């Protein structure tokens, strides 16, 4: 398995290095000024520690060495401009402060219009003005006419009307013949571009099939209408013109006996591995893919997001941008992204839905409202084999889309760039790591450390804590409207396609994989309750309480890992590697999900005695909730394995990709856990239902939300139900306690899930003869009136007066 990881990264590193040497060159700055940008234009900053502009730095380099061509000195670079106090240009700052964004061939491969890139190459080699005219024509003309116009301009400059007529004849040829004739006329530059990009685009945009290859280089064909399953993991993946769906391996194990845990300083001995000896089963499940070819003729594929601006982060005020990028090399993530790649990535996330229940799924870039039935909303449980009410599911999905996705998309799109999103994730990661250390136990750190419910955050030993993470009080979130938007909407940043693409593969696929399943589970959750009938069935309440406990434990394990990874990044060079062995070794994560013995114990204690296949068949909500939890556990574990493997191979770009991907997924996990608690609290307080949770899990949840407050803004019970009622009123949906009439009783069958969930071990470290005691949720919530319920001080005072 590790050889598969190694081969995949080796091939990627070789591909990037080979592509960088012969990447197409453009007139710097002109390419993005001449196009119609999809988002707001880049900002000009006044901070001398930020980036320098394209033309100013290029001119300064040309003045220093007039004998050399600027395009040879800076192949494929895009730069930004900074001034002192907004007036004086800064061209003498250090090389690290004037950070350069490299646009490698990997980004060039993501552009759809191949012939335009080839014309750019030839235009730069022959005449600088010809390239600028061709790029200007590309932004204004239709996609089908862009190649013809560019060739016409080139023909007028070189060979006149004769070559122009030949280009027009080539433009009307069929499919591959048109590109081959154009290659013969334009020369070797365009032929090289076609060799690099043409095959990936042709394979990916095939209407009838999508080709991929497995670890043994065996190609297999995926039909969009059929689901496939194979036991081979994708180990070496091509990077096509768009973000291609990577198959995520789920690490399932047979029952084993766990008898203890191990600290980091003890090392990995044979007895420790013997306790976790098991047979792993890895598989891939590929569902039907949407064919994105129709997007090619609806959107201008030449458009790109503007060049991104990276800033210093407030969490490290004494660190310059150059020093920050040396530690966290995220500049490759800030490259402009093609609009078509964004749209296709948005479609990939939507493909998780069932065609029977969701013919049209919500998307980030949706411009139309989802179809639903206005009027009364009936939320009773439908008994049967995956039976659900199509009316209720459509209404619940519309409410979810209105409250979370569409609101977040309107607040972020065209206002916040994915470069700002990367900066927010990095700043929040450092802040939550400091809070984890401040609130943690500061002892018993290491692999397999059982973070029990009352003390969920492990923290770090004092000798392993960097100076920048040693705080004497809780670190608060950064201020500003942009930060407030990115912290809200139940962790909606994972739905942002630009940000998922920016963190690069395989993190893009991991986040998409987990987010898609959690999204589908939330659609069904929103279809089961409203303010007049917030109750679930007893089975649903019991199972949702168990999943809430598991999500809190999983989120705490992810926060502990992020804290240790951040400390390793910021630690002084003299720190021993053994202090951070928990994030540098990948082997433990192959045996224990998230390397958390507590999580494995709780899975057995809460779900071990449940007949999961029968429950999932009778309750579609529980079925998708189980699938969502399994997907999140798999994705989080894969992030940790990827980080450790990249550390061994010294691949810093993939390390930081896995690091930020885990931070992004943690925000979505916190949002889903918040939503589960609000629904359970509504059933307990508003519906009068008895719900029991393990004692201490609500304390762990409150501590987790307090530590992760720079990353996620917790939503209270009162604000959630008020926002939900407002959304229903806006959509014209009325809550009712009536039973669904038979004439409107349209029952459909949701797609059955694959019962692939496995327990790590049927034996637990926690003594089975002493089960975890439970408490009533309604009584336990009274301890957190302000934090969870959202009651103001006047309401609390009135409650105390009535009580005493």
Swiss-Prot record:
Stretches with biased composition (Acidic residues): 62-72, 118-204
Composition bias, Basic and acidic residues: 94-109
Domain of life: Viruses
Pfam families: Herpes_UL47
Post-translational modification: Phosphorylated by US3. This phosphorylation is required for proper nuclear localization.
Places the protein is found: Virion tegument; Host nucleus; Host cytoplasm
InterPro entries on file: Herpes_UL47
Extent of Polar residues compositional bias: 32-42, 82-93
GO BP term, pick one: regulation of DNA-templated transcription
Single GO MF annotation: RNA binding
Assembly and oligomerization: Interacts with US3 kinase. Interacts with ORF24 and ORF27; these interactions seem important for efficient virion nuclear egress. Interacts with ORF17/VHS.
Further details from the record: Expressed in late in the infection.
Biological role stated in the UniProt entry: Tegument protein that can bind to various RNA transcripts. Plays a role in the attenuation of selective viral and cellular mRNA degradation by modulating the activity of host shutoff RNase ORF17/VHS. Also plays a role in the primary envelopment of virions in the perinuclear space, probably by interacting with two nuclear egress proteins ORF24 and ORF27.
Protein name stated in the entry: Tegument protein UL47 homolog
Naturally occurring in which organism (per UniProt): Varicella-zoster virus (strain Oka vaccine)
